[in-house]
């Protein structure tokens, strides 16, 4: 398994997001004025909320964009909003060593409208071959499947969050994390995701309804 992380700061929307990528080789409505402060990209078997220390955040700043166009959740990132969105990439490897970039790179885009957060992911393969699929069930073991998971730190406390993910085979994974503990996978909501597989990569598209998550009232960050 090769794992890595990268940290980005996204401006203009919502709350902190934590992304997890694991690639195995060979009750309130959110308001548009709330600031989206930080995105951390990870590929590791825990959420690692404390990884921000010592990182130059300004170096990894990207902006989310609001769209008024209809986004078709089909696993094909061809709408104008996707084509012009900032891209988070260049993951830093942390397992088995933390001495360089991950050999399998990932591209992440985030856009939103009044009701939904959209996440677009392109996961490139570093070696050819069949992608590991241990299960097609919901809430699969993410250490045994190629997958991508996003954590929404809606309370901006690096301790609590909502998780949404998919495997390369298209299975969904979602849950709630409280007080920095393990993720409770009994929490399931209706959200949309589609995965497309290609010879050298797999692509995923998420649509996460804002009504399904909560945040601190009056939060500005």
Please report, for each region that a protein language model flagged, where it lies by residue:
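Structural preference for beta-rich elements and adjacent junctions enriched in aromatics
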Residues: 50-221
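Bacterial Sec-dependent N-terminal signal peptides
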Residues: 5-56
């Amino acid at each position: 398994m090769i794992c890595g992380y990268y940290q980005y700061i996204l401006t203009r929307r919502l709350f902190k997001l934590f992304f997890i990528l694991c690639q195995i080789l060979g009750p309130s409505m959110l308001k548009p004025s709330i600031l989206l402060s930080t995105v951390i990209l990870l590929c590791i078997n825990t959420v690692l909320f404390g990884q921000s220390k010592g990182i130059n955040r300004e170096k990894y700043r990207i902006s989310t964009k609001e769209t008024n166009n209809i986004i078709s959740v089909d696993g094909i990132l061809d709408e104008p909003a996707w084509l012009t969105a900032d891209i988070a990439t260049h993951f830093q490897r942390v397992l088995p060593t933390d001495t360089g970039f991950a050999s399998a790179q990932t591209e992440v885009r985030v856009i939103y409208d009044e009701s939904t957060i959209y996440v677009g992911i392109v996961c490139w393969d570093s070696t050819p071959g069949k992608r590991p699929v241990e299960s097609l069930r919901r809430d699969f073991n993410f250490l045994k499947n190629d997958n991508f998971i996003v954590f929404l730190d809606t309370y901006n406390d690096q301790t609590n969050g909502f998780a949404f993910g998919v495997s390369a085979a298209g299975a969904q994974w979602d849950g709630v994390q409280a007080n920095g503990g393990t993720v409770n996978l009994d929490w399931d909501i209706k959200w949309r995701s589609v995965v497309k597989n290609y010879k050298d990569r797999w692509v995923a598209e998420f649509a996460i309804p804002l009504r399904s998550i909560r945040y601190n009232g009056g939060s500005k960050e």
